[in-house]
């Protein structure tokens, strides 16, 4: 109740009061007039009764702070207990649980909980006595001994909404006094939680009390009783008002009393409570009531246990449902892309020992097997890292086919530019006419590739005629020496040169229809061979394997191939592939498929435009199959009008992985008419096969001449002059050849020299076959390519210098080294050393040095080399090469005859792998 109301209540009872504030919104009415009926017999003043009725009418509201008073004298208590019993019975009918606390001479003083805003806090002060006289004497004795009672402590409820106990604490002296009181059958002060819980169970109701969400900063209620004065002095300090209340609900009992039910329904109404409701006399019924309270308390605890069990079972059910949901959802979830990556490898150099630290095991094995010593690794750490990265890039290459590279699309005619522009967006990986990643050298109008590309000229086995690439070779075929090491002097080994026509003069011509219409039977075998190589493990250490091959049914003559592989194991490169959802993956695959179909239609439409109409069988006759690739065969034929020999390559477009490159190559070659380039003649599209007709060079490749003959400086000069003329033309057109070597230099019987991109030739032997199928050897590569630097057309000049060494010594430098070590030596040694440099003239030495300058800026161009004295003064005429070409052909025929005799005597046990 309010302070004003309390002031009015003080004179009504005639008792001195001290105010004490409990930190609650309200307390229910206490039994302040339990024995007023007995006091009324002593003092029957009606006015006192009326005033007490007014006190009951002015009950406390729920939102008001609760005040309580204590009595310091037994005389004052006896004056306060004079209330009529009949009025107590009338008040009992109205009674609810709201009133102020009056600790008079009472058997029991209870402070019960009141519902307010869904919060609850239980607090009680219970004083019990056996009878009225004992209570009066006890209170007087307590007053004399100045016993001090502490105010009630409030404890917050637990998570289940039930307070463990709210205890009324009593000082140690009071506890000793209470023990004495119990022994003398005096007033029993029950301050423990059992009495409190018993009181709650007797009420059988769920009550809610609003408690502050924050504890008051400071609250002190001190009640001091005077020993003899009979007056009570209270010292109270201000406390901060609590903030918004927190709501906790206590479980209600199954049995509820009518009075508390009314109170719960009307929490804000005031009601009067008569002393009859609050008074518990010392009567024979008291033990029965205590037993009832005990049983009710047990019922309350059993209800609490049931609620706890029910809550725990609900929690288990919810947890199981959550786990089932998570397990069902986890089956459909996809793993996200990696995050928070770790730096696993960090390569460094030990400052004390100078050795590498942190190298992956694969790299260490690769370097150990490559022949690169630790000393070399320590001396050129960056070079080793560069060549290993370069080697891995080439090994992981997906098979981009080698075509004549262009580095200035602006120099091409509009037809080429327009046709190529349609396909530039189709495949960003191709190199021809690709503008991305090729910085421009403005002074020359050239583009220099910012990313070195591997030598991936996928040549046909016939070392002479192809401007169209075959499908990519296996990874282990990329860095393989194109010829074995020279034979020791005096040592003779059985020749294993492959023979297309053991005796060319006796070779029978197959009908045109038979060669064209019949699908090449070795194509399927070669396709399987290529696939098995691609899917095979990483390259092994150098090894030599020889195998005999059976004759091909479609070839006009038996052929044999010796597979001489020299490979190095490449460390795997860890790659992270992000996981794509199934639907997104399907959509992406469908889009890619649609794009492929669209590009295929565009390609066929464009090929139909540029290809000549008609059937090639009607224009060319006497087709002789001289080679077989994975995508088709190579034939020699005669033009029905001019009777000139031509080379025809038949390609199945469905087997070509890079169809756009074929179109690009045709368009480039149509614009590259030159006397030193194997020229494109015509093309046909018949029944899904593309027929490319090219100029035929019957003398074969320069490799045959280099292998079987020794060249003079004049003859070397003639080869260099004709090669430089072809390079000058290509460079003027903005084309990078990037694969200048003896395999791609073709000769006629008269000694004429022409460049070809893929090294087709009329006759192939074991070396030719190896050099054409195992392409991309590093031995002719320029240092800037190996070191992953930008490069331009001068890479062809370096390759020309290596080819000069090849003509002088019969093989390129480092041919006997492993591919990785060869890359390392190219990157670190710079200009290779000749075995016998003193045998060369000064003119040739200077010319060679100019070609092999490590710095591309110091290296000569094709035009500058054509003006060098070695070309202008020493180089001989082309006719000087004719005897060498004929001599090489004779030696090849002899080797073929030996091979034919060996094939007749030995059983054929291995399948034909001739390409």
From Swiss-Prot:
It is found in: Cytoplasm; Nucleus. CDD domains: CRIB_PAK_like (cd01093), STKc_PAK (cd06614). SUPFAM superfamilies: Protein kinase-like (PK-like). SMART domains: PBD, S_TKc. GO terms for molecular function: ATP binding; MAP kinase kinase kinase kinase activity; protein serine kinase activity. InterPro entries: CRIB_dom, CRIB_dom_sf, Kinase-like_dom_sf, PAK3-like, PAK_BD, Prot_kinase_dom, Protein_kinase_ATP_BS, Ser/Thr_kinase_AS. It comes from the Eukaryota. Keywords: ATP-binding, Cytoplasm, Kinase, Nucleotide-binding, Nucleus, Pheromone response, Serine/threonine-protein kinase, Transferase. Residues 587-598 have a biased composition (Basic and acidic residues). Residues 73-82, 318-331, 448-462 have a biased composition (Low complexity). The keyword Aminoacyl-tRNA synthetase does not apply. Residues 184-233, 243-252, 260-284, 431-447, 492-503 have a biased composition (Polar residues). Residues 620-871 form the Protein kinase domain. Belongs to the protein kinase superfamily. STE Ser/Thr protein kinase family. STE20 subfamily. This is Serine/threonine-protein kinase STE20. The gene is STE20.
